[in-house]
């Protein structure tokens, strides 16, 4: 996700923000109007920094306190010599007290207020979206939709106040239609709905302004979401001892790659070997063994039809990855039955999740890594329901299946039953085949190195997304392959 300055690592719900804003202001001895002034100042400062040569701003104000923030921006922009046009949705005389006070300041400057027009003024350089704030829980009213569409189609850059209008700040769901902002300025506390799912298409570059009350707010509110910190790798992966040997660095077993699906296993095994496992082994369909030995000679690859070797590998491994290219035939089902109860840390993906959906089980030693379609199958619901509230979906998955859940997608989430974490790294180039197989390989390598389940899942997701970001910085997003991530893993791990 695009940011300019490092963001805080904690995110909150709208309920926390609504009450916490008042409490923090009170504890600081501030009127809520003074907090509104600070909000407007923050939005103006960030917008002007992004568009310093702009001359004409269109500020769109709604009927709540978000609109009041917009009027403060209008006053500040006018003082800077910027031409300002204000569009007000609804009657400004019915604004809440603090927002009405801001409106009066604008009027005292001689500022005009207009109802939304059918066209955006041609001279507009910047649009400020102060229509709807964090309180939006319902689909936008039909009479508002044309305005949102007009602003989106104008081709003008949009800076959203706190949250793009039309986006649910708790879930990231688009409530019918939504402002597509180039920049969003989140105030006091970052909202959890800004960083996952559909929100990633609408927020643009995310900025944060604490308004001088962030410390007080944080003292009284437990985050509903935390971001994954890449510094985690330094504590989890300390420098290796000079006398270490491969057996001490973890033994990972990967089972998958049915007939015609060997590529998934090759990607997974390659990622495992590149992620620091001391020894990596694979059990696969006999058709894939030669390719595995040729492409990844570091991985000990054997046919899963050799039953005695299969059993030896099961006893040998420190961690298991099950599912990449496994298939859904009778043999795959037998393998699932044999390995389901294995008492080692494990990560299940792809076809393993298909079998899990049809034969649910709870396992505290397992990581599952569904994408939204797989998550919907595991929950017995529609994909749209998963994407409408990814937080609710991942909580249900963790409660039903245990262990750690990684809900993949834009703004991947990780839930260990204690907290939910989000990955801010990653980019649209990752929407290509084989990416999930690489993630599974990374995670099983970390598990084999005795990293706890939750930490392995979080660090694995961060490494995976960060490797993709490193590659696309040099080569662009379109055409990114899962195998392109492999060289960067070693760099990030060290």
Swiss-Prot record:
How is this protein named in the record? Answer: Bifunctional NAD(P)H-hydrate repair enzyme Nnr
- Pfam families with a match to the protein in the record: Carb_kinase, YjeF_N
- Asked if the keyword Lyase belongs to this entry, the reply reads yes
Q: What is the E.C. number?
A: 4.2.1.136, 5.1.99.6
Q: Where is the YjeF N-terminal domain?
A: 17-219
| Region annotation NADPHX 1: where it falls in the sequence | 65-69, 133-139
Q: Does the keyword Protein biosynthesis apply?
A: no
The UniProt entry's sequence similarity note says: In the N-terminal section; belongs to the NnrE/AIBP family.
Q: Which parts of the sequence bind (6S)-NADPHX 2?
A: 325, 437
Gene assigned in the entry: nnr
Gene3D superfamilies named among the record's database cross-references:
3.40.1190.20, YjeF N-terminal domain
All copies of domain YjeF C-terminal, residue ranges: 229-494
Which cofactors? K(+)
